[in-house]
Regions:
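Transmembrane signal-anchor helices characteristic of membrane glycosylation enzymes that use polyprenol
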Residues: 2-30, 38, 42-45, 179, ...
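Loop-to-helix entry region of an early transmembrane alpha helix in multi-pass inner-membrane enzymes
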Residues: 61, 65, 69, 79-97, ...
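Transmembrane-helix motifs of polytopic, lipid-linked glycan transferases
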Residues: 89-109, 147, 151
């Protein structure tokens, strides 16, 4: 009975979310991300023979663009007549992945009931729900971050089981690569997860099994980093001429420039412009329009 009620509830929520997708207008940057994704998708499918459109997409070397490329791929299977709605639908699916991931993490740390409550709270959070469809970056990053953390938790618990260990190594690598492939410069956000893993292995020892192997952990960590890095640069064509130096170079250029600390170029009203060109009143205006 409980499963039936849960299924009806989830179905109703998904249908309502789909209805919201149809009601939303086009955000100022949605087509820019989509066209950028298409440009890189054509480059990848042509194995590099189709050159990137550097005239239209200036300064995009600072954006690794994994999600834009993957989103563009999925929209090819949906109606081109409703391209904006198709993009929003893909965003919606990744948003639900994020919420289900939060539920699973809560279940691991507490219990199944707490997991369900967390699911509902996150879903009905107006800030998150309002971004579920229209946000082409943040919800995907949240989903990747959450699932990376979840697979790390499962790895710590099940490392002694060889089959599960390989499974979680692969999925954590893909989740990490997806996160890095959206914004490599946001890598610092993973610091709490790394700190949690360090404390769990060497101090708390609550999740890990007695058979937990430090040696295997180090080997698996190296595998995760290599796979994640290769996944990231795959969707970052501007780095393909030197995948070891250019990602770091572009990231540093994006963080430090002649005007001080911060990205030299940002997306503003659908265009890539210099940070110094943004009006000083933009933050206040932006916050005003996000008020309930």
């Amino acid at each position: 009975m409980n499963k039936r009620i849960s299924f009806i509830f989830l179905s109703a929520i998904f249908v309502y979310s789909g209805y919201c997708v149809l009601q939303l207008g086009m955000t100022w940057d949605v087509l820019l991300h989509h066209e950028l994704g298409k440009d890189r998708l054509h480059y990848l499918f042509s194995l590099g023979s189709d050159k990137l459109n550097e005239e239209t997409f200036k300064n995009t070397k600072y954006y690794s663009g994994a999600y834009s490329t993957i989103s563009a791929f999925f929209t090819y299977f949906l109606s081109k007549k409703y391209i904006v709605e198709s993009i929003y639908f893909v965003n919606l699916v990744f948003s639900f992945f994020a919420i289900f991931g939060i539920q699973k993490i809560s279940k691991e740390f507490f219990n199944k009931q707490i997991g369900k409550i967390t699911f509902v709270i996150c879903l009905f959070n107006p800030i998150f729900f309002g971004h579920m469809s229209m946000n082409s970056i943040d919800v995907a990053m949240a989903s990747a971050y959450i699932w990376f953390f979840y697979t790390i938790i499962k790895y710590l618990k099940k490392q002694h089981i060889e089959g599960k260990r390989k499974h979680y190594v692969l999925f954590s690598a893909l989740a990490l690569g997806f996160f890095m492939g959206i914004r490599f410069s946001f890598l610092i956000m993973l610091l709490p997860i790394f700190l949690f893993v360090f404390l769990e292995i060497f101090y708390f020892k609550i999740l890990i099994n007695k058979k937990f192997s430090i040696k295997n952990f180090i080997k698996d960590a190296v595998k995760v980093i290599i796979i994640a890095y290769l996944f990231m640069v795959l969707f970052w064509p501007e780095t393909h001429s030197n995948i070891f130096l250019l990602p770091i170079q572009f990231t540093m250029e994006g963080l430090f420039h002649s005007f001080g600390f911060g990205p030299p170029f940002v997306l503003y009203n659908g265009d890539v412009v210099g940070s110094y060109e943004i009006p000083k009143s933009y933050i206040l205006v932006n916050l005003y329009y996000k008020m309930p």
